[in-house]
Amino acid sequence: MPKFKTHTGAGKRFRVTGTGKLMRRRANRNHLLEHKPSRRTRRLWNEVPVAAADTARMRRLLGR
């Protein structure tokens, strides 16, 4: 049986932790940051786990 290919867009956006959780970046931290409070941009820096409802779909895209 052939190997599954990783969806390249998903491969760039998500990473799998050592325990198998899927992590993603938060939105709203690419541009137009001047008017956003520093507190908000600091909090947006951290990665967060993918929602449970989306995890199965993302795993399929990542070929896992």
From Swiss-Prot:
Record-linked InterPro entries: Ribosomal_bL35 (IPR001706), Ribosomal_bL35-like (IPR021137), Ribosomal_bL35_CS (IPR018265), Ribosomal_bL35_sf (IPR037229)
Q: Which UniProt keywords apply?
A: Ribonucleoprotein, Ribosomal protein
**For this protein, what is any one GO molecular function term?**
structural constituent of ribosome
Q: Which Pfam families match?
A: Ribosomal_L35p (PF01632)
One GO BP on record is: translation
Q: Which domain of life is it from?
A: Bacteria
Please give an example of a GO cellular component term from this record: cytosolic large ribosomal subunit
Q: Which family does it belong to?
A: Belongs to the bacterial ribosomal protein bL35 family.
This chain belongs to which protein, by name? Large ribosomal subunit protein bL35
Q: Which organism is it from?
A: Acidothermus cellulolyticus (strain ATCC 43068 / DSM 8971 / 11B)
Q: What is the lineage of its organism?
A: Bacteria, Bacillati, Actinomycetota, Actinomycetes, Acidothermales
Q: Which gene encodes it?
A: rpmI
